[in-house]
Amino acid sequence: SKYSIHSYDDSVRPKAEGVYNSPYQIKDYDLGDLTDLLLKSNDVLKGNSKIVTATSMARIVDMNMKYVCSNGSNLEQNFLYVGPGFRAIAQDGNIIQSRSYTDQCQQTGMEVFNEEFIIKKCESICKEAVELLSAEECPTEKMDLVLHSDQMLLQIHESIGHALEVDRILGDERNYAGSSFVNLEDFGNLKYGSDLMNITFDPTIKEEFASYGFDDTGNKASKEFIIKEGVLQRGLGGLESQER
């Protein structure tokens, strides 16, 4: 087409065949039992008179994807995303604090709805939300910072994940999700961090939110370095975007 932004090449759509299934121990569940557990957990979240709002939820997504292409590809992927979410909001006068726990970024089964674990977690959420009401304010000064793994996950997601989305770098999503400070000429050259920084993209790791056997164009999942010894190697995107 005279209006195409890039010429098509068959190499960006390799033939693929196979099956991928999310790992899980338990898939079936009783809706009544699950509802009872959420109601019970909500009562535990409201275990202090200073708790003004409590929320308990369950997220269950069971998805089947069938991919057939004229290049001979024929593959099937079955994804099961399961996870609970709990939140308590505490108030004392004009001071309001909240504490939460969400475990929804994973592929697993109904085994995550373990009552003993959930009740203990909700007790902690309630207790910590109330404790925050009387906690001292974080001091305003320059200091060394040690990040917990949960916060480090978010830091990597925002500072590296979004910034290296190839569709952002190419400008395809500029009006929708924004662009990136990374330029095409930065690949193989940009010093992203110290020599100790090594970051990989690996969808073959089990139980992760982004685990899969094949991407949306049928490309087989594999472990790839995106930053090696501090230097940017590649972006995040399908073969067609990478070719551009």
Residue ranges of model-derived segments:
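Active-site bordering "gate/hinge" segments
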Residues: 1-214, 219-222, 228-231
